[in-house]
Amino acid sequence: MDRKILIVVENLPVPFDTRVWQEATTLAANGYTVSVICPIGKGYDKEYEFLQGVHVYRHKLPKDGNGALGYAREYGTALWHEYRLARKCYKEVGFDCIHGCNPPDDIWMIARLFKKKGVDYIFDHHDICPELYEAKFGKTASMFYKSQLWLERQTYKHCKFAFVTNESYKKIAIERGGMKAEDVFVLRSGPKLERLKIQEPKSEIKRGKKFMVGYLGVIGQQEGIEYLLKAAKYIKELPGHNDVFWGIVGGGPDLERMKKLCHEMGLDDIVEFTGRVPDQKLLDYLNTADVCVNCDEYNAMNDKSTMNKVLEYMALGKPLVQFDLTEGRYSAQDASLYAEHNDANDMARKILELLDNPEKRKWMGEYGRNRVINELGWEHTSKALLEGYDKYFRSRGK
């Protein structure tokens, strides 16, 4: 089988980007020749390596841009390196199509440069960039917001077919991107159960507290860590409830600001920010947690997006609390309690409801894990990836 795919991801390296790496290794395991272009970072600094059957090409990037000139420099530099490495990959390995993973919505430009060679563009829609811009800056009338809509339209205009993470994104692909429904495949970012091992809790992590609330994820502007800290303060100030430890696992651009806010709120004795940690330490914390939290605030971006952490909590058999978001509710269903939109006090009350009811926690955790085992795990969701590419290559006579 001579089916060759080049995956381009601009914002994260592989294997750190779990979705992209699962896609790449699944395709390679099913007989495809797979290459990936990505940035250097997160401890992955080799410019080339052949890893688990995948050719990986990496490039350096400037620091994240701020302002129009900063973003132009960041994205322009990325596009140049992607084009340079795509040419190198085409000569050394070859590819029939470029599988572009956003954000940002600009990788179609690289694919256009290879169109005369018969290379098609396949879009992998990870984030809805117009809504992401709105969540960060709130300026839907601005030129930059409109440019995000234009880039998204161009992305769909130039792609042969698309993978999307959920039904909300599929609706956008059809209504905003003009795609035919049969050319849009829902490829959910299901976790691999062999990566997320259930193990015995480590009581020492709780710092002597009776309960632990866990969070896993990026510490960024739109992740809603402020709500989590407000919920922690609400519970701490209730009489007789200074028995909860909060473990916040993950790094990101807002980590230091959130640490400072935590200190100002007087929560240093019950909240720990671990930063980015090795996988085993991550598992230690999540397995020790009694309840896990997805504190992403309600906005147009988060309401339509599937959060990996929700599925990872479920895979580990953890009950969770989150704000009532469309795709969050679809993923978790009865494995979660749902707080009112952006109401930290209601989130705190929902957390207390679970901490006070061990039987309910156990039932919800088992429900969530079974949902991953039987429906939402990568073993099931990856079928859409293989179906989409089989259809594509058969249309090319391969």
State what each model feature region is:
Residues 168, 189-190:
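Carbohydrate-associated surface elements
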Residues 17, 223, 280-284, 294-315, ...:
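Nucleotide-sugar-dependent
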Residues 336-344, 353-359:
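Conserved acidic donor-binding segment of nucleotide-sugar-dependent glycosyltransferases
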Residues 83-87, 106-109, 113-117, 129, ...:
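Membrane-proximal helix-turn-helix segments that form the acceptor-binding/catalytic region
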Residues 239, 249, 256-283:
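Nucleotide-activated donor-binding/catalytic signature segment of Leloir-type glycosyltransferases, i.e.
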Residues 44, 79-82, 95-118, 122-131:
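An aromatic- and histidine-rich active-site surface loop
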Residues 1-44, 48-56, 189:
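N-terminal subdomain of nucleotide-sugar transferases
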Residues 6, 163, 206-232, 247:
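Conserved donor-binding/catalytic core segment of Leloir-type glycosyltransferases
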